[in-house]
């Protein structure tokens, strides 16, 4: 897809790149990440390298370091986007905004609410098989339990996203 973008447009500025990348390339890189999130370093690097190469399409940014290119293009690392997506889905599940019963994935830890935590902490269970430690229901627990009360009790998904993004930046 990146090759097609390169040969289809003679000169791509950062605004055009953002529109093309966000509509054509990024959806392919983020397809079904809650079901299959890469956990091997080689897979994570491989996906990130696609974005790294894609950001070099903008001629003015070719000689700038990758983290700086991301800031200029208002992009984030794919791993950060996957984590954000996991947190949004967890929020939606726990608040009944999905047609899936969250109890199939999580158990609320009602007995361990303290001043540093929040009221919707999840119990952490060890997986029976090593391969299961990368499943959605296991990989989100630590990150979710580390969120603030303000984030977890957001009144809507949009408010949760805004509060999560504010806390992460």
Segments predicted by a language model, with ranges:
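Hydrophobic/basic alpha-helical segments
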Residues: 1-169
